[in-house]
Amino acid sequence: RIPTIMPGMSKNEQLELACIYSIAGKLGGRPDMSVRPFRAPHHSITSAALIGGGRLVEPGEVSLASKGVLFLDELTRFDTRVVEQLREPLESGRIVINRITGSCELPADFMLATAINPCACGFYPDRTRCRCTTWDVNKHYGRISRPILDRIDISISLQRVSFDELIGKNVASEGIKGERRMDEKTGAGGRRKADENAGKRTDEDGDMQTVIGNFDSSNMRKIVERVWRVQQERLGEGRYNSRMTNDEIKKY
């Protein structure tokens, strides 16, 4: 869902991405450069395929995902040495590949999204089904180094949903109804406060629209577009809050 709420790409971003795909020989398989890329490599991927490399240097997944999303499912199943290669691009948005014949610098400005199970069997902390020891669980999470964790801004823990819950009711709908009931109880003052916290304007013409209970992709994208426009006005095209310097953080 992440790519569906991200704003369209600027002309400069499209041109940069087209160059990357052209070098990789994949331009024909991606005719629409206005849509941000979403790359989800298999956990068996090598360092060269992820970062880029080869005798004749070719862009890796980090460059093919530039200006879009790189999704690593089951992060703990990836080779630890491969994951560690993400430090540089996550920090700088670029990747430098060194060869005997010289060095090559490629764009690698992507959003990293990952998913992991709570343990090797996937049932922790349900001790009626999980057979992993505390040592096993710690070892499972220990495959992700502290430097990589430091580069991840948001971490969300999800509880297992039973099969009966999945087929018996729409969990999202129930949550939305609950928010609306709470909104009715808080009254007008509560609604004004919720509007301020959630984001007031979502339409291009500046019309006021409450977004609580309406978090579909199209509505969320309008909010993101509005926020990105503010960032572009402050920092310039192609730079967002994640690339702010210390001085810029203090200023804004």
Where are these regions (language model features)?
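Walker A/P-loop
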Residues: 1-26
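Conserved RecA-like P-loop NTPase ATPase core
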Residues: 2, 14-17, 50, 65, ...
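Active-site phosphate-binding and catalytic loops of NTP-dependent enzymes
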Residues: 10-12, 24-29, 58-59, 93-100
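Conserved alpha-helical scaffold flanking the Walker A/P-loop in AAA+ ATPase domains
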Residues: 31-32, 37, 48-70
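Basic, amphipathic alpha-helical bundle interface domains used for macromolecular binding and assembly
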Residues: 57, 80-252
